[in-house]
Amino acid sequence: MQAVARKFDVAGRDERNRSLGKAGEERVLHHERAILASAGRQDLARKVRWVSQEDGDGAGYDISSFSPEGEERLIEVKTTNGWERTPFHISRNELAVADSNRDSWTLFRLWNFSREPRAFELRPPLNTH
């Protein structure tokens, strides 16, 4: 067997992943606002925040939203172009925030994003999924 050398653009891959993640977060932000507005909760829709863009990474979630009943939702968005079981990275901080906010934290999983986006949500504890 012979090894084949090839160049791998790590910076390009990282930029594509960041762009994909940002697009997924933006889609979830609009989705959350639309759900609240359609439930007659424009007051809450106006309070939905894109935390990772406004405050930066490190909060352990990307979107701060609400249920139509007014309960807090802390949403971590994970987006891939592959199928629903495509691996994705979740940080120790995200896992810790999920564990300490089990009632409000949710992972919003977007997959097949560039073709026909699909989604599902996972709630803590994540090790059961």
Q: What kind of feature is each model-predicted range?
A:
Residues 9, 56, 64, 124-129:
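Poly-acidic low-complexity segments
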Residues 39, 46-47, 69, 74, ...:
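Active/binding-pocket-proximal capping segment
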Residues 35-66:
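A short acidic/basic microdomain associated with nuclease active sites
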Residues 1-41:
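A short mid-domain helix/strand-loop element embedded in enzyme catalytic domains
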Residues 58-60, 70-72, 85, 102-105:
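Active-site lining segments that contact anionic ligands and/or coordinate catalytic metals
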Residues 28, 32, 61-65, 73-81:
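Conserved catalytic cores of phosphodiester-cleaving nucleases, focusing on short active-site segments
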Residues 77-128:
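Catalytic cores of nucleic-acid endonucleases
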